Amino acid sequence: MTTPFKRVHLIVMDSVGIGEGPDAKAFDDEGSHTLKHTLEGFEQSLPNLQKLGLGNIEPLPVIDKEVEPQAFYTKMSEASVGKDTMTGHWEIMGLNIMQPFKVYPEGFPEELVNEIETLTGRKVVANRPASGTQIIDEWGEHQMKTGDLIVYTSADPVLQIAAHEDIIPLEELYDICEKVRELTKDPKYLIGRIIARPYIGEPGSFKRTSNRHDYALKPFGRTVMNELKDNGYDVIALGKINDIFDGEGVTESIRTKDNMDGIDKLIETVQRDFNGLSFLNLVDFDALYGHRRDKPGYAQAIKDFDERLSELMNHLQEEDLVIITADHGNDPTADGTDHTREYIPVLMFSPKMTDYHELTIDSTFSSLGATIADNFGVKLPEFGKSYLKEMGVEK
C-alpha cells in the first residue's frame, strides 16, 4: 500500500507547553505558560523553531512570527483528566483517560506502606518526593546497614524503590517491584509506574546503575501504535516511550541518555530504511528543568534542541513527516514542582511540502494519533480527527 508519507517522526518535547489550557483553573494552573515564561529574558535566538512557525501559534519572547512558516502549526488542549506524562502520551496515541493517575506530594499513605512492608518483609524508609541522587545520598548508608527499602516519589505518578545491589540482589529487587506493581493497580492507589532504582558504591560516592527497570501499567485500550504494529509497520520507540507504553505496540526500543543523545539516536534512525513511526521523548525539559524550576536551564535546553533541528532536517527523506509537540506543561516559574495544565504546540513539516499554514486548534491530543493512523491506512482512534485533508495531503 502506498501511503502519503512512508515514515512519521514524532518528537515529544516533554513538558514544553504553550499556555494555560481552557480548564487550567480546575488544576490550579491559571496563568501558566511554559514557553513564554521560560523564554522571558532569554537573550539568544531560536532560528529553527521560529522558521517553523512556533511564534505563529502564540506570541513568544525571542521567537518572531513568520510570514512564510516552514511547517503547519497549531495547538491542542488535553481531553483527559490528568496532566502527567503517561496520560499525555496515551492521549496522543488515541486514548481518553477519564480516571487520573494519582500523585503523592506528601508521600504514600500509611496503609500502602504497611502493605508493602507486609508483602516484602522489609521496612520502608524515606517515603517522600525527592530526586534519586539526593535520596540515595541521604538514606543509602542506612539501607546498607538495615536492608530497608528506600521508597520515594516525584511530581509524576511513580513509586520508586532504591536498594544497594550488594544488599538486595537485583532479582529480589525486581521481584519486590513486581509485587508492588500488582498491589498498586488497585484504583485507590492507581500509580502509573513502579521503578526499581538499584545503586552501588560506598557512603559519599553512591552511584545509580543502569539496571533500572520500569513496571508500567499497560495502556487502557488499543492505541495507534498497536494498529501500526499489527498491520506490519515499524514502531521504533526512542527514549522512555517504550516504558510509557509498557512495550505495547512497539517493534523496537532504543534507549537514550539525555536530550542530545535522543537527537543523535533519532538521526541514526532517520538514516535507516524503515516504514512506519519513530517516536521520541525528550525528557530533560521536564525532569532536569521543569520540576526543578530551573528557568535558565530550561531555556538553554530549548536552544540546544533548536540548534540540532537543522541537522535533523538535513537527513530527512522526501517521504518523511516530522511532528514536534509536547505532552503537558511544566512552567518553571509556577509554584510547587508539578506539571501545569497547558495547550501543547504542534509543528508538522515534510521535505515534499511547501504550502504551510495554520491548522484548526483541537480539544484533544488524539488528533495527532488520528493523523498518523490516517496516513498509514490503519484504524483511526475513537477520539480526534486526522489533519491530512486540512494539510492538503492527497491519499
UniProtKB/Swiss-Prot annotation:
Compartments (UniProt record): Cytoplasm
InterPro entries assigned to the protein according to its UniProt record, in alphabetical order: Alkaline_phosphatase_core_sf, DeoB, Metalloenzyme, Phosphopentomutase_DeoB_cap_sf
Cofactor dependency: Mn(2+)
Binding sites annotated in the UniProt record for Mn(2+) 1: D14, D327, H328
Gene3D superfamilies: Alkaline Phosphatase, subunit A, Phosphopentomutase
A Gene Ontology term for the protein's cellular component: cytosol
Entry GO MF terms: magnesium ion binding; manganese ion binding; phosphopentomutase activity
Key words, A-Z: Cytoplasm, Isomerase, Manganese, Metal-binding
Gene Ontology biological process terms in this record: 2-deoxyribose 1-phosphate catabolic process; 5-phosphoribose 1-diphosphate biosynthetic process; metabolic compound salvage; nucleotide metabolic process
EC number annotated for this UniProt entry: 5.4.2.7
Pathway per the UniProt entry: Carbohydrate degradation; 2-deoxy-D-ribose 1-phosphate degradation; D-glyceraldehyde 3-phosphate and acetaldehyde from 2-deoxy-alpha-D-ribose 1-phosphate: step 1/2
One Pfam family cited in the UniProt record for this chain: Metalloenzyme
Residues the entry annotates as binding Mn(2+) 2: D286, H291, H339
Superkingdom of the source species: Bacteria
Enzyme class, first EC level, given as a word: isomerase
Catalytic activity entry: 2-deoxy-alpha-D-ribose 1-phosphate = 2-deoxy-D-ribose 5-phosphate; alpha-D-ribose 1-phosphate = D-ribose 5-phosphate
Record text on cofactor binding: Binds 2 manganese ions.
Family (UniProt): Belongs to the phosphopentomutase family.
PANTHER family cross-referenced by the UniProt entry: PHOSPHOPENTOMUTASE
Role according to the record: Isomerase that catalyzes the conversion of deoxy-ribose 1-phosphate (dRib-1-P) and ribose 1-phosphate (Rib-1-P) to deoxy-ribose 5-phosphate (dRib-5-P) and ribose 5-phosphate (Rib-5-P), respectively.
Protein name: Phosphopentomutase
Organism this protein belongs to: Staphylococcus saprophyticus subsp. saprophyticus (strain ATCC 15305 / DSM 20229 / NCIMB 8711 / NCTC 7292 / S-41)
